């Protein structure tokens, strides 16, 4: 089977619009959660979200500006979730050193997903429909809002003509997208895949819908809103952004002298077949994804140096994922450090797994495991080695990252230091 390595990374996140900014924010324990600015929340119980900061002044280079990554005309024909994906893909390509002039474009593919697509486009055009009639609907509404346009726009902007897929598995989208990119290279369907996830759903209907599910935190304190594994957790905080990585067949990467960050060695998936929003209570579905990934990677539970948990800060997810980790890793579960990146960036939905995968690769590169920022006290059954207060500096060889999505989707990746 062909080996698959990571040679480039790109990120747009609530704590930084590049991988370096994101990782420096992670190491500093920066929390990207603040009051929602995209719309008036007067009538909403939820006041907080982790937003990518909008452009206010041209000099504020930390703010996202689509025109830094594409021309104005292209940007106007994309919704934010597509813009974020293209921006992250551009950074990943630059980071990888891949020169498409020297590549067979049909051997370079895309696996980028979005859990939702554009709710904002649907909302604004629904308003036009009600107020002015169907003739005023934007003729580009459908290609603006559908989830596959993130992958489509990455392909168009970067000239990638190979396999192009759009995975939609709710909150597992980013991890599944990277996993399917990995499989595509393993099985010879591509030599290079741009893989990841993207999301921009902080809108009235997005916040309103998740709030109606009672899935969102109603905390008014940004530091205590997204607190995975804490006994006072009361829901997730919606985030937005994108993460894209360049996956490459090992010999292809070596031949062109690429810098190799890490190697993917295992990918596992399962379905709970249980409930539309809740994970399986005993954790058996997620545990199967973990054990499948470990089996393919040929690693034992004792070999896992770090688990980047799905850790959403909801009561059910964090408890049931804890049970799943215990089922999958047995006695070793109590020793391995566990943390959730969502404690700092919120829940990026379809982008979550991709951004968290980048955090895992950086953990391997830097020998650093970030904490669960805001974690104060856990409950009785939550007795794993959750990283608390300060990060851990240690050699990190093998990392497991988990994602669980509405509908019972479970996905796990094993990424390890390249040797």
Name the predicted role of every residue range.
Residues 8, 26, 89, 110, ...:
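Conserved small-residue
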Residues 6, 27-169, 198-207, 301-317:
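Conserved beta-ketoacyl condensing-enzyme motif
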Residues 189-234, 267-281, 311-318, 335-385:
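Acyl-CoA/ACP chain-elongation machinery
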Residues 1-74, 251-261, 358-372, 416-419:
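ACP-dependent fatty acid/polyketide chain-elongation machinery
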Residues 131-138, 179, 183, 199-255, ...:
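Glycine-/small-residue-rich "gating" segment that lines the acyl/pantetheine channel
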